[in-house]
């Protein structure tokens, strides 16, 4: 559960990084973050999850993993790839 909790903190911060430039991605991730935290807190206080709750928690967690990795790609890799692709297309003309 420690790994889940550590990643949940990182996933919760993802919309903050995306808010200014990519608001649609940030708004898409917010419902999954809320679901993930509600189910994680219910698991911590009740001590167990039923099969459906467990499946929904893992689904929300993995959707947040995908959104966070996409956000990292958009924020950090895309600015470096974009100038190279422009020079490549300009050289083709």
Curated annotation (Swiss-Prot):
InterPro entries: Spore_morphogenesis_YwcE
Membrane topology recorded in Swiss-Prot or TrEMBL: Multi-pass membrane protein
Keyword Membrane (UniProt): yes
Residue ranges crossing the lipid bilayer per the database entry: 1-21, 30-50, 56-76
Subcellular location, record wording: Spore membrane; Spore outer membrane; Cell membrane
Originating species: Halalkalibacterium halodurans (strain ATCC BAA-125 / DSM 18197 / FERM 7344 / JCM 9153 / C-125) (Bacillus halodurans)
Superkingdom per UniProt: Bacteria
Keyword tags: Cell membrane, Germination, Membrane, Transmembrane, Transmembrane helix
Similarity remark: Belongs to the YwcE family.
Functional note: Required for proper spore morphogenesis. Important for spore germination.
Record-level GO cellular component terms: outer endospore membrane; plasma membrane
Cell membrane keyword on record: yes
Protein name: Spore morphogenesis and germination protein YwcE
